Amino acid sequence: MSVPTLPTGPTVDLAQAAERLIKGRRAVRAFRPDEVPEETMRAVFELAGHAPSNSNTQPWHVEVVSGAARDRLAEALVTAHAEERVTVDFPYREGLFQGVLQERRADFGSRLYAALGIARDQTDLLQGYNTESLRFYGAPHVAMLFAPNNTEARIAGDMGIYAQTLMLAMTAHGIASCPQALLSFYADTVRAELGVENRKLLMGISFGYADDTAAVNGVRIPRAGLSETTRFSR
């Protein structure tokens, strides 16, 4: 198979396409039930496999779940959540996000729940929305991203690069997505349902076609300015 090559210098078309692609990708939290054709899915995941990694190790193992298997997994996750059977491969603790990180997180939550019409003291509605997230926000597909059992920060970095590459590939094909860390809070449940052994669950990515009528999909979260995150030195 021939490998496509890029122009040796920057081109207006390529730069504009990159900007549209990167800025056009967003987390979608309401999906239509229409499935993505299998041929399209295979093309997207093949493209994502070209993501870079340390020494070309390609540590990702991806389980793409659809149809009846998707429905069984969703119900298993909802049950595990109701029974408080939390099993996390990569520990999460309160206070993980501090300072400006917590400020950005709080701003995101305020915007999201305002769009949903949920107040912070409406615990029943908040729990109901958590349940909806465990059903992949109605997406007909979910990709579970597993890493080797010995995964540490360096390998996790490769997994993040793959995840972003995958979501950009989806965006290019008109497919909406939502990366979900919550799905990894029930790692044992996911492994049991999918028959996966000796791998750690890092995250899930729900995907399908966006429901553009849902108010939650109209939420736009601002990004930090360049000066807040990046320094140029000479």
Curated annotation (Swiss-Prot):
Swiss-Prot/TrEMBL induction comment: Transcriptionally repressed by MSMEG_6503/MSMEI_6332.
Keyword flag Flavoprotein: yes
SUPFAM superfamilies: FMN-dependent nitroreductase-like
UniProt: NADP(+) binding residues: S55, R105, Y113, I118
Binding locations of FMN: R25, R26, A27, V28, R29, Y137, A181, L182, R223
Alphabetized UniProt keyword annotations: Flavoprotein, FMN, NAD, NADP, Nucleotide-binding, Oxidoreductase
Cofactors required: FMN
Function: Confers resistance to antitubercular drugs benzothiazinone (BTZ) and dinitrobenzamide (DNB). Inactivates BTZ and DNB by reducing an essential nitro group of these compounds to amino group or to hydroxyl amine, respectively, using NADH or NADPH as source of reducing equivalents; two electrons are transferred. Able to reduce the nitro group of bicyclic nitroimidazole PA-824, but not of quinone menadione, nitrofurazone, methyl-4-nitrobenzoate, 4-nitrobenzene methyl sulfonate or 4-nitroacetophenone.
Name by which UniProt lists this protein: Nitroreductase NfnB
Species for this entry: Mycolicibacterium smegmatis (strain ATCC 700084 / mc(2)155)
Gene for this chain: nfnB
